[in-house]
Amino acid sequence: MRGRSEGGKKKPVIVLLCVASVVLVFVYLFFGSSNHKAIEYGRKLGLGGDDDDSTKKDDTSSSFYVEDVVGNGFTPRSFPVCDDRHSELIPCLDRNLIYQMRLKLDLSLMEHYERHCPPPERRFNCLIPPPPGYKIPIKWPKSRDEVWKVNIPHTHLAHEKSDQNWMVVKGEKINFPGGGTHFHYGADKYIASMANMLNFPNNVLNNGGRLRTFLDVGCGVASFGGYLLASEIMTMSLAPNDVHQNQIQFALERGIPAYLGVLGTKRLPYPSRSFELAHCSRCRIDWLQRDGILLLELDRVLRPGGYFAYSSPEAYAQDEEDLRIWREMSALVGRMCWTIAAKRNQTVIWQKPLTNDCYLGREPGTQPPLCNSDSDPDAVYGVNMEACITQYSDHDHKTKGSGLAPWPARLTSPPPRLADFGYSTDIFEKDTETWRQRVDTYWDLLSPKIQSDTVRNIMDMKASMGSFAAALKEKDVWVMNVVPEDGPNTLKLIYDRGLMGAVHSWCEAFSTYPRTYDLLHAWDIISDIKKRGCSAEDLLLEMDRILRPSGFILIRDKQSVVDLVKKYLKALHWEAVETKTASESDQDSDNVILIVQKKLWLTSESLRDLE
């Protein structure tokens, strides 16, 4: 009897343990183990803005719960807040993800710096918090030379590169004297020296507008690109998320065009014949590896007659190893039909040929080979590099160059590559005029909320032919033109207009740090990704990640999409600024314009730091 009585007492305990186990398993499956690690549930948010007390606390809980149902999904009243250590999260360039997923990558090929996006179950569906004490960024043009230290609390480069004048910490700010590894005395003097080497008029590197788009590989904090802006040269400053700690984040905080990327195994997200000049100042790249594949990738993106400016010990040092590298590089570029345009002191500038004549005149079996005729040089998203030379089109060969007008006429001149899409000059001109009118409308709606210097970094999430960016020419802004990878690859038209951008899939996160853009333009992009079966909610969270606090989003989409976005405003801490129906004369007259502003909010930990 005694044993049976004790067994009877144990049964309820066992049942309770089983029920508790089931509940825990359900919670684990619902929230996802990887997401839970990144989130502190129930944290408080402090909301603030330019007109608010930044230390005012809000009672909004960051724990997730459902307000109502939209279609087959849920609309949250609030999103959880990511842990503070994720304040600089770049989902597709997250080394913690690489470790957790045990990806087998070849470090010697820089694969660990390439894009590796999380599967849906590993996404951090939470709001990225700003760092403690975050301030609205300093406005352009002052931002070129100084940023708030609290916004990017990384001073490693200031100490490591102290002898090269990259950056200097001064009180609450980080200053940028304009130095670099091979231009300690200033990027402006270095740029003028390069122009002088090429005998360009007045030592101006744009050569009367003939040179407009540059690529700076291993750009550091992008002072080279920042100082080129004064010469009306647009530079895509490129560097990986590596041990140099946040160099691209500094560049974007300064208001300088920049992109996180690496010369590894995949093609750069730019079409062929995009840049007039590529630049490498001691970028520590082994150009001879894998049959010169990295140099051939630069060759692919350079225009006919384009330049490669190379400042490195190999160009001038006399020790045995540097001399060996110089001999082998010289032989390689010679077989690629490059010639030396100028060489002085520490810098050599090579030039590509203007036509296919040299390529076709090489001896049979010469390496590197010409690319196969069926190889598309403009296919770039997730495409492996090829160790071959891309020939010019018949048009470029016959015209002995790209046939582009000098800047600024280039912006509104029909690009020669329009014919690749079957677009006429009339279509191009109508598109340019349509977006001029639309941008005028946008600025009329925004003007009560912004000053002339409020906006600097802009992203057009579906850029088409780049006419949105073209309409902003007279404003002191720059535009990252994004062309979705599943549509017409019109990015080459954008580069031919003297603008810049990248190919991307909005089903994935963009290669940039959080809080790097002042304004996002979302034309039909939410509708498009829903058609692809991707998550509109994920896209909205990604837009929030890359938008600066107090920044704006211009949404131009169908009424149903605008209604959906409005349901997320509170959860995302966005505020609707203006709503307007498109003009009846507009070709997208069924579109609705919604302008939202991201509020500045701080976590409770940040607020305590301010007290």
UniProtKB/Swiss-Prot annotation:
Protein source organism: Arabidopsis thaliana
Family in the record: Belongs to the methyltransferase superfamily.
Compartment(s): Golgi apparatus membrane
Membrane spanning stretches: 12-32
PANTHER family listed in its UniProt record: METHYLTRANSFERASE PMT1-RELATED, SAM-DEPENDENT METHYLTRANSFERASE
Superkingdom of origin organism: Eukaryota
Database matches in InterPro entries: Put_SAM_MeTrfase, SAM-dependent_MTases_sf
Keyword field: Glycoprotein, Golgi apparatus, Membrane, Methyltransferase, Signal-anchor, Transferase, Transmembrane, Transmembrane helix
Glycosites: N345
Record's miscellaneous remark: Co-expressed with the galacturonosyltransferases GAUT8/QUASIMODO1 and GAUT9.
Protein name as annotated: Probable methyltransferase PMT1
Pfam assignment, any one: Methyltransf_29
GO molecular function, one term: methyltransferase activity
Lumenal side: 33-611
Gene Ontology CC: endosome; Golgi apparatus; Golgi medial cisterna; Golgi membrane; nucleus; plant-type vacuole; trans-Golgi network
Gene Ontology biological process terms in this record: methylation
Taxonomic classification: Eukaryota, Viridiplantae, Streptophyta, Embryophyta, Tracheophyta
Signal sequence residues: none
Cytoplasmic side: 1-11
E.C. number: 2.1.1.-
Protein topology in the membrane: Single-pass type II membrane protein
